[in-house]
Structures are given as C-alpha cells and as structure tokens.
Regions:
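Extended, low-polarity transmembrane helix blocks
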Residues: 1-46, 62-73, 77, 84-196
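Perimembrane loop-to-helix junctions flanking transmembrane segments
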Residues: 49-63
Length: 196
C-alpha cells in the first residue's frame, strides 16, 4: 500500500514542472479585467473623479482626484504588468487595495451575488425580490416584444452588483502576491535569473 501511495505521489509531483501555468492563468484572466476597469476610468477622468467624490450618488471618498488617478493608473498599468509578468507581487498590492475599496464602498450593500439568483447561496432580500421582477419582465417581453430575438444572444438576468467578482479578484491577487508571477513565462522570473 505504501508503494502504491509513493508511486501516486511521485506521479503527482511530476506535474510540478508545469506549476507556472497556475499563476500564468491568473495573470491572463485578470489582465483584461483590470485593463477594462482602468481604461474606462481613464476615458472620462472628470466623470470618474466626480463619482469618486460625490457622497450622494458616488463613493464619497476623500481626495477624489488623487484616488481616482491612483485607481485608474493602477488598474490600467497593472493589466500591462500582469500580462508581462513584471513586478507582479508589487502591482498586486495596489490592485488588492482597489478591490477592497470596491468591496466595501461599492458592492457591500448588495450582498454576495453579482448576478441575482434566488436559488444560489447567500441570496439576500434584494436578490429574492429580483426573481419576481425578472419573471414579470420576461412576461412583458414575451407579450409585447420579440422574445426569441431578444434572447438570441443570451437570457435576461438582473445584475445584483454584489461583492462576488471583486472578492474573487482579491483572492486571485492574493495568490499572485504570495506566489509571484510564476516561472518561465514571466518577466519577473527571467529578471530574477539574471540577478542571481
């Protein structure tokens, strides 16, 4: 039995040769996410700054101009760095901060779910109400619209805007912060090799 276990463990250990694939996958997944977030902020900085600072319909953050620029540049620049695998542990820090701000300043009041699904775990009252509203919207669209055409690109959903995506990105960034960019396919790896 011990021999079987050792052989299985050896076979499993052989896969460590490809352990660079996990951080590479995280980087490739996160790069377009942060590129879109950062470039959208940069495309209209006056509106972004106003949203960061306005306490009535925005985030109500102090120093909105500074924080908006820091967030936008961290996200857009971070996307490029993640893609190249350059300074990944360093850029993970400000990106984690932006995710924490997103979680607590934007998404927290909406609960966990990003897309309202009353049958999923962590459904709050807002999500439970969304199911009834979605059913009514579908009835209206079936009666008064071309429902088949309207749903030909996908079904309708109600966006709940909960913390789910921001929390997921935070966990992914945490893994990159502690594990680094990975070997072989990252600039960090090759720079470290040159410095040794």
């Amino acid at each position: 039995m011990k021999t079987v276990f050792l052989r299985l463990q050896h076979a499993l250990d052989v896969t460590r040769r490809a352990d660079f694939l996990a951080p590479l996958a995280l980087r490739l997944y996160l790069a377009p996410v942060f590129w879109m977030a950062g470039s959208q902020k940069l495309a209209d900085m006056p509106a972004t700054i106003e949203w960061f600072g306005n306490p009535d319909w925005g985030l109500g953050l102090p120093f909105p101009e500074l924080l908006a620029w820091l967030a936008a540049l961290s996200e857009a620049g971070g996307a490029v760095l993640l893609l190249c695998g350059l300074a990944v542990r360093w850029i993970s820090l400000p990106l984690m901060v932006t995710m924490l701000v997103a979680i607590f300043a934007v998404h927290w009041p909406n609960g966990w779910q990003a897309i309202a699904d009353p049958s999923a775990p962590f459904a709050n009252a807002q999500v439970l109400e969304a199911g009834e509203k979605l059913a009514r919207a579908r009835e209206i669209l079936r009666e008064y619209g071309n429902y088949d055409w309207l749903t030909s690109s996908g079904s309708f959903a109600i966006v709940n805007n909960g913390i789910e995506f921001a929390a997921t990105y935070l966990v992914m960034l945490l893994a990159l912060f502690f594990g680094g960019a990975g070997k072989c396919l990252s600039a960090d790896f090759w720079i470290a090799q040159k410095l040794r």
